[in-house]
């Protein structure tokens, strides 16, 4: 089965979108839009997670999908990591509801904070086996896993699949560029390295993604796309709006032409290996050829025991297995530490040279933030610290 286009670049000299075509599901014809709205049987208000998925479908970030997965595709993805056409997918893209009356063939008007964003044309509705989904996608049924807890406690009883007709993107506190907009900013015929994060960027992160441009499998004159997720994450994470403000301040402070910035309205699942695959698919649609992946990417700890749900290299190993089929490459993140003698170097080099390693734990950092104590510049950018203190 042929899963990908054989060409390595599109007409603009960039990696082609996943499946070969960047989908744009936004309807511009006002008559068609009004007709779809008039034929909608139901009106559902989207949760923030739902709204993120609707937006990513509309702009083509989930290409080649043209809507929420139906039952057959859902089952195929959770069991095989592939849709029914054989394309790799890390996690199912589904719409949830408690409405018992909705049936195939009907249309649902989707709103977000009362804004009419899309119509979902239902072709499939089912009651999923959430225990099976949790076990296959997250490796556990424990409610101590944030996504498993979300599936059981937040999602509705039913899943709904069907074509999405987009009207307008959700109005957010932070602007998120579409794949088409990001692609227009990228250089032709050069590697584009994606850096994913869900927290404010500190010095170690900066060193990590700038060092990635020097990796053996990254060509010269390449760029890095810093592409943080600004949607829902874990309960104790910093709010998306605050994270966005730290990124904007840092973008101005760094002002490096090798670094491109965009923000992703994605809802984190903390699914470890499967989420690494999902992130790579999305970043390919945004024009990235490489993906930085480090220890315990998209991992999480049990809320009761504090134990990790995934091994430190599970995500990295799984991503490496999928990379060729995705026409992408992974860039392992180095374990960087700060030394008095030489600044940021690898932990292995610091140990070999017997250099003194400077450390500041997350707990200590937050304490200094709260108490207004000085934070060393080797650890955090002043602009980022200022935003966090104001918030």
Model regions and ranges:
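Active-site cores that bind ATP or allylic diphosphates and position pyrophosphate for catalysis
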Residues: 2-391
